[in-house]
Amino acid sequence: VQHTDRNSYYGAQQNPDAYGKTKDLTWVVGGMYVGNFEKVLFSPATFTAGMEYQNNSLHDIMLGYHRDMKQDVRIAGGFVQNEWKMNRFILLAGFRVDSHNLIDNPIFSPRVNLLYKPTDKFQARLTWSTGFRAPQAYDEDLHVTAVGGEGVLIKLADGLKPEHSNSFSGSVDWTANIGHWQTNLLLEAFYTGLDDVFVLEKIGQDEQGNTVKERRNGNGARVYGVNLDGKLAHGRDVALQVGFTVQRSRYTKYENWSEDENVEPTKFMPRTPDYYGYFTLTSAPFKNFDMSVSGVYTGRMHVPHLAPDFSVIPENYEYSYIRKDELVHTPDFFDLNLKLNYTFVLNDHIKLQLNGGVQNLFNAFQKDLDKGGFRDSGYFYGPTQPRTYFIGVKITN
């Protein structure tokens, strides 16, 4: 059970009527059965079945924007799957059925997974799975972005259909010991096709002059790429984990993202970089001392930057803004973090740990944030905080 009672303010130009209140209650109940059988068809197997019921009641009020939205979502679902265990193969097949009160027909979602493991140090996997996203209001739809001193509201289109996904992936996983070092390498390729993908399109203004965007079904999208993960460890002394992904996220046809007819549509899915990766290095060279260094690389991406309505901006305003909507190709970022820990043993039962470090050491942060009361508050990308120093104390028993 989860309950949210949130007071909010989504206003611009110190709008006194932009306060709101959201109440959201979600509860889930379900059960599962697992049975092991000596033989099902051709090999020993594990059978799993389960049922689940979800209920979500949402009431969002923002009187200043004339919004009073009530949404009740009820989902009844069930799944069955069987896992066959053979000498070198493990085959898993199953499906899930969901009945959603906002969708006319039940959603059938099958999946298949085949694992090949000839030795303890090597395995290969093939997976096919399906899924959906229901045509309902999500948490991001409740937030009101401010552009040009006015609010931007999101509404659902009439007849909005569910978004469906069809995913394929294949991977190989290799593990080896080289002297006193333990190594692991994972190479994965993936492809996901999205049909009736959700897109946002600007449709005009409401009676209060706020911009209204409508969540509609687009033509479709494709997300595909390769991922490489590696691990290297030498006991407690040092451990390194790295990963890098090359990905393409594209709409199947050009989609409009701005109502300005002079702005070109795009096939790029917004805020999805083509390259991203990470690394984590931990070391404990001494008995009471350990450290960690980690980094996240975020490649360039396309982010919409919306221009304000200049007819409402006073002359000689202290901030300047772009003249028309732009699809910005952002720079890439490398966010490096460092943390040091030292533990003092006070007695047999109590330990005192002092820690300190820095987050975003290189201060990789967006340089072109809009400013002032007419800014595009949704124009934000990259690391969420600039260079930050921290210290901490932890007592354990």
Predicted regions and their residues:
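C-terminal beta-signal and adjacent terminal beta-strands/loops
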Residues: 195, 297-315, 342-397
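Face-selective signature of the C-terminal outer-membrane beta-barrel domain
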Residues: 1-104, 182-191, 225-227, 239-245
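Repeated loop/turn-to-beta-strand initiation elements of outer-membrane beta-barrel proteins
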Residues: 39-47, 88-91, 121-124, 178-183, ...
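Structural signature of Gram-negative outer-membrane beta-barrels, strongest in the C-terminal barrel
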Residues: 44-46, 67-193, 245, 282
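Transmembrane beta-strands of outer-membrane beta-barrel pores
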Residues: 1-5, 53-59, 86-88, 95-101, ...
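Membrane-embedded beta-barrel scaffold of Gram-negative outer-membrane proteins
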Residues: 1-10, 117, 125, 159-216, ...
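Gram-negative outer-membrane beta-barrel transporters
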Residues: 85, 90, 184-185, 189-193, ...
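Residues that define the transmembrane beta-barrel architecture of outer-membrane proteins
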Residues: 23-27, 70-76, 106-108, 164-168, ...
